[in-house]
Amino acid sequence: ASNAASKYNVKALSVDEILENKEIELIINLTIPAAHKEIITKSLFNGKHCFSEKPLAMNFTEGIEIEKLANEKGLYVGCAPDTFLGAAGQKARKLIEDNKVGKIVLGTFNLMSHGMEHWHPNPDFFFKPGAGPVFDVGVYYITQLVNLIGPVKQINAISGTATNERTITSQPRYGDKIKVETPTTLMGSLEFQNNAKVQFFCTWDVWKNNHSTIELYGLDGSMIVPDPNFFSGDLLISK
């Protein structure tokens, strides 16, 4: 915080100092996943709205508790991802609603890379409970699919971990080891309320692949949706 304050000429304050500041109405919560609920809850108790990084909480029960508290306090809580509101997500939705590919019946999404330890300065939390490929990045894909297809009815999945230890190759901690405490590969399928079925592959155990990020198959055509980590991108339709 001190380094950022010096670089951008802003104040570095503790969490308590920020929460006690009456001029601040909205908290942007960019802490690690394990701290999300605590910061959101403290923000609400101090009369402040909160927009948080994903995931909203460590589990479903905590998420419901946050929703209940926000409603009781009459405050707003938002959470990433919001990329589905961008041009690509909204254009894809418009095309589906206009029946350009017919009813969506099948699909795939693939999130495949070799993790975060090669670029992030402090990547440990990515491999702890509350993170991993689904909670950290997969939620962008799932949110986009809910935007395009609707609610999920059920899920089937298996998970695994390729290695129990990762080596940091980014600076300033090059060579340090990370203990892996959450699955780094998850594979499965989503069944939506409209009976569409989407197969998924989320992993940080793959060096390279040539899969599209999201492909949707309708009764009258197919659609390739661009990477939902971004707000824009090229949509491809084939018939």
Question: What are the roles of these predicted feature ranges?
Answer:
Residues 1-5:
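NAD(P)-binding Rossmann-fold cofactor-contacting core
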Residues 7-8, 46, 148:
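Short, structured coil segments at secondary-structure junctions
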Residues 10, 25-26, 106:
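Short, Asp-centered acidic motifs that coordinate Mg2+ and/or phosphate
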Residues 10-22:
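Short acidic low-complexity segments
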Residues 23, 31-32, 202:
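Short glycine-/small-residue-rich Rossmann-like dinucleotide-binding loops
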Residues 26, 32-33, 37-84, 99:
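Beta-strand-loop-alpha-helix segment that lines the small-molecule cofactor/substrate pocket
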Residues 83-179:
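Predominantly a Rossmann-like dinucleotide-binding segment in NAD(P)-dependent oxidoreductases
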Residues 143-234:
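Contiguous beta-strand/loop segments that form the cofactor/metal-binding neighborhood of enzyme cores
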